[in-house]
Amino acid sequence: MKVTFEELKGAFYRVLRSRNIAEDTADACAEMFARTTESGVYSHGVNRFPRFIQQLDNGDIIPDAKPQRVTSLGAIEQWDAQRAIGNLTAKKMMDRAIELASDHGIGLVALRNANHWMRGGSYGWQAAEKGYIGICWTNSIAVMPPWGAKECRIGTNPLIVAIPSTPITMVDMSMSMFSYGMLEVNRLAGRELPVDGGFDDNGQLTKEPGVIEKNRRILPMGYWKGSGLSIVLDMIATLLSNGSSVAEVTQENSDEYGVSQIFIAIEVDKLIDGATRDAKLQRIMDFITTAERADDNVAIRLPGHEFTKLLDDNRRHGITIDDSVWAKIQAL
């Protein structure tokens, strides 16, 4: 089914206000969920909203909490999220990293006791739109086996790197081949994954998203490489924030809350003039996209460039929502 941005935001706002969330907080949160969905990231927008409400109802998320700065060391700050709403807090933290970068050239905010930030790419994009390089990542509850194991002991720990090119170039990726959100998107659409994404009941690689969801055995991105990256990203976020590691979140909490996150902004224009920056970025992009295609019908992709078209399509033709997901939201 198709809905407009206003209909989608209104549905989110209604549910939030029914939980006695303050009007301004409900409006800002509904706006972010709707923008994420409108951008084409359904897995961490509309599809994730019922799960968000479940955690809100369970008390994992404290909607009126205010993040507090704990430590300030020039370009580096450490904050405690106080388990406030994840996407609103993450936006504030990237804004703060940008402010620090304006003063120091680089800004780093380490956040502890945070909630799921929904679409991590929103915060990298937020920096790149203002002309900064944006880098951020989060740890999570253990939802992926480390390479060589059957049990989930590491997080998907998504990493975002956004570059202020035209259009914005951005990598937004979990350390698994597919996030659980993307497994759900493909399952709801009745699609196999384009490549192996996890293991079946017999320990064999499979493209069946439903089987992987059931078994909780997703495949690390790049096999041992994604597993290794997940571990070191967790270590850095834990140390810089003085927060909880994947092990602590998994073993000490009843659900995924109290995670640790990093937000970095770099003001490129302090290091290179605008014309030179743009020329260098354009040369990189041209060099890549003019390569001979492996398939004449498949364009060479630059990460993040597809979001401009997705956003335009959704604004022109309406936002496609899975009927079952929409029914869940209407029932909340």
From Swiss-Prot:
It holds the Pfam family Ldh_2. It comes from the Bacteria. Its main location: cytoplasm. One of its GO terms (molecular function) is 3-dehydro-L-gulonate 2-dehydrogenase activity. It catalyses: 3-dehydro-L-gulonate + NAD(+) = 2,3-dioxo-L-gulonate + NADH + H(+); 3-dehydro-L-gulonate + NADP(+) = 2,3-dioxo-L-gulonate + NADPH + H(+). The keyword Cytoplasm applies. Transmembrane segments: none annotated. Its EC number is 1.1.1.130. It is found in: Cytoplasm. NAD(+) binds at residues 168-174, 224-225, 304-306. Catalyzes the reduction of 2,3-diketo-L-gulonate in the presence of NADH, to form 3-keto-L-gulonate. Homodimer. This is 2,3-diketo-L-gulonate reductase.
